[in-house]
UniProtKB/Swiss-Prot annotation:
Probable catalytic subunit of the gamma-secretase complex, an endoprotease complex that catalyzes the intramembrane cleavage of integral membrane proteins such as Notch receptors and APP (amyloid-beta precursor protein). Requires the other members of the gamma-secretase complex to have a protease activity. May play a role in intracellular signaling and gene expression or in linking chromatin to the nuclear membrane. May function in the cytoplasmic partitioning of proteins. The gene is PSEN2. One of its GO terms (biological process) is calcium ion homeostasis. The keyword Transferase does not apply. Residues 1-87, 160-166, 222-223, 271-361, 410-413, 435-448 are cytoplasmic. Residues 19-30 have a biased composition (Polar residues). Gene3D superfamilies: Presenilin. Residues 1-70 are annotated as: Disordered. GO terms for molecular function: aspartic endopeptidase activity, intramembrane cleaving. This is Presenilin-2. Interacts with DOCK3. Homodimer. Component of the gamma-secretase complex, a complex composed of a presenilin homodimer (PSEN1 or PSEN2), nicastrin (NCSTN), APH1 (APH1A or APH1B) and PEN2. Such minimal complex is sufficient for secretase activity, although other components may exist. Interacts with HERPUD1, FLNA, FLNB and PARL.
Length: 448
C-alpha cells in the first residue's frame, strides 16, 4: 500500500502574518476590506465572488491575501508535484537497497537456497514428477497462504477499529523481537560461516543484542529517521529471505500473482481491510504504526479530519468566505480546514508551523514481496544475472508508474499490482526467451 501525505490546501487565510508587505507598496484593497467587521467582510467577499464570476477574471490581490502572492492554482499544483519528486526518488533508494541485500545474500550464502523444509502455511509438497499435480499443490498452497494473510489483516483492522492498541503494540513488538534477534542471529551465523570468519559466542550474542536493542528503540520509540529506515529495510530483507528459503518454487510465483490481486482489492474496494485501516486512521487523526510503514520523510501530526477543537485543545484556522469556492477538491469531496497542534510556548499570536513535511509511505509488505520476486529470480532456475536485473528494472518501472498515479489521484493506492505484474512478465520472458538466445550466441561465440 502506497500513500502520499500532503496537505489538501497550502493557502493561508488573510491575517496579520500573511498580508505583511513592504511599507512602500500600498495595501491591496481586498486585504483592507478583510480587516472590517465580520458582516462587512462576508458581504464584501460575496460581492467580489459574484463580480469575478460575471467578468470571468481573477483578482491577483486575492492570492496575496491567501498567502500565495500572484500564484495561480495551476502553478501551485505544479510546484506541489515538483516538491514531491524528491520523495519519489527517496523511495527508490530503500527499495533498491532492500533488493540488493537479498540478491547479495542469495548469491553468496548457500543456506538460503537449500531446500530443506517448508512453511507450515504451505503444507503441500512439489516433489512430484507430474506437472498437473505440482500445479495443483502450488494453487492449494497459495489459497492457504492468502487465506492466512487475509485473516490476519482483518484481525488487525478489527483490533484497530476497537482501539485495542496495547494488543497491537504487543503483537508488533513480538514480531520485531523475533526478526531483530532470532533471524538476525541465524543470518549473521550463516554469513560468518560462508566467509569463514571466526567469532566466539559471547561476541556474537553481544553484537546481536546491541543490534536488536537499538532497532527496538528506533522502531517502537524514538530514534533518528535514517536509522529507523535502515532497520525497516533490514527487517524486510530478513523476512524476504525466509520466504525465499521456505516457499516452494511454483507456489512462490503463484503467491506473488495472488498477493498482487489481493492488494488491489484490499486497498481500492470500499470495504477493503487496508482501505478501512487508512480511513480509520485519518478519521482519528492518528499515524499508522511505524513498524508496518516505511516513510520517506518525517511527518508531523496534522489533522486530516473535521475535529472539535475544544475536545483536543487544538487551534483551528478561522473561516474565510473567500475560500468557499475552493473548499472542494477535484473529486467533489469537501476539504476541511486543517487542525494544528498548539505551540508549547508563546502567545496566541505567535507563528505556527503550518507547513506539513510531505512524504511517501510504503508498506513493509511491499518491500518484502518485491525482494521475494527478485530473490527468487536469482535463486531458482538458472539464476542468470540478465533475469535478475530484468526483474529489478521491472519493479522500479512499476513503482514509478504507481507513484505517478499516486500524484494524480492523491489517495492510497496498492503498490504491488503493477510492479509484480511487470516483474512476472519480465522474469518469464527473459528466462524463456532472452536467456536461451544469449546462451546460443555465447556457444557460437557471437557478440552483439
Amino acid at each position: 500500500m502506497l500513500t502520499f501525505m500532503a496537505s489538501d490546501s497550502e493557502e493561508e487565510v488573510c491575517d496579520e502574518r500573511t498580508s505583511l508587505m513592504s511599507a512602500e507598496s500600498p495595501t491591496p484593497r481586498s486585504c483592507q476590506e478583510g480587516r472590517q467587521g465580520p458582516e462587512d467582510g462576508e458581504n464584501t467577499a460575496q460581492w467580489r465572488s459574484q463580480e469575478n464570476e460575471e467578468d470571468g477574471e481573477e483578482d491577483p490581490d486575492r492570492y496575496i491575501c491567501s498567502g500565495v502572492p500572484g500564484r495561480p492554482p495551476g502553478l501551485e499544483e505544479e510546484l506541489t508535484l515538483k516538491y514531491g519528486a524528491k520523495h519519489v526518488i527517496m523511495l527508490f533508494v530503500p527499495v533498491t537497497l532492500c533488493m540488493i541485500v537479498v540478491v547479495a545474500t542469495i548469491k553468496s550464502v548457500r543456506f538460503y537456497t537449500e531446500k530443506n523444509g517448508q512453511l507450515i502455511y504451505t503444507p503441500f509438497t512439489e516433489d512430484t514428477p507430474s506437472v498437473g499435480q505440482r500445479l495443483l499443490n502450488s494453487v492449494l498452497n497459495t489459497l492457504i497462504m492468502i487465506s492466512v494473510i487475509v485473516a490476519m489483516t482483518i484481525f488487525l483492522v478489527v483490533l484497530y477499529k476497537y482501539r485495542c492498541y496495547k494488543f497491537i503494540h504487543g503483537w508488533l513488538i513480538m514480531s520485531s523481537l523475533m526478526l531483530l534477534f532470532l533471524f538476525t542471529y541465524i543470518y549473521l551465523g550463516e554469513v560468518l560461516k560462508t566467509y569463514n570468519v571466526a567469532m566466539d559466542y559471547p561476541t556474537l550474542l553481544l553484537t546481536v543484542w546491541n543490534f536488536g536493542a537499538v532497532g527496538m528503540v528506533c522502531i517502537h520509540w524514538k530514534g533518528p529517521l535514517v536509522l529507523q529506515q535502515a532497520y525497516l529495510i533490514m527487517i524486510s530483507a530478513l523476512m524476504a529471505l525466509v520466504f525465499i528459503k521456505y516457499l516452494p518454487e511454483w507456489s512462490a510465483w503463484v503467491i506473488l500473482g495472488a498477493i498482487s490481486v489481493y492488494d488491489l482489492v484490499a486497498v481500492l474496494c470500499p470495504k477493503g481491510p487496508l482501505r478501512m485501516l487508512v480511513e480509520t486512521a485519518q478519521e482519528r487523526n492518528e499515524p499508522i504504526f511505524p513498524a508496518l510503514i516505511y516513510s520517506s520523510a518525517m511527518v508531523w501530526t496534522v489533522g486530516m479530519a473535521k475535529l472539535d477543537p475544544s475536545s483536543q485543545g487544538a487551534l483551528q484556522l478561522p473561516y474565510d468566505p473567500e475560500m468557499e469556492e475552493d473548499s472542494y477538491d477535484s473529486f467533489g469531496e469537501p476539504s476541511y480546514p486543517e487542525v494544528f497542534e498548539p505551540p508549547l510556548t508563546g502567545y496566541p499570536g505567535e507563528e505556527l508551523e503550518e507547513e506539513e513535511e510531505r512524504g511517501v509511505k510504503l508498506g513493509l509488505g511491499d518491500f518484502i514481496f518485491y525482494s521475494v520476486l527478485v530473490g527468487k529470480a536469482a535463486a531458482t532456475g538458472s539464476g542468470d544475472w540478465n533475469t535478475t536485473l530484468a526483474c529489478f528494472v521491472a519493479i522500479l518501472i512499476g513503482l514509478c508508474l504507481t507513484l505517478l498515479l499516486l500524484a494524480v489521484f492523491k489517495k492510497a493506492l496498492p503498490a504491488l499490482p503493477i510492479s509484480i505484474t511487470f516483474g512476472l512478465i519480465f522474469y518469464f520472458s527473459t528466462d524463456n526467451l532472452v536467456r536461451p538466445f544469449m546462451d546460443t550466441l555465447a556457444s557460437h561465440q557471437l557478440y552483439i
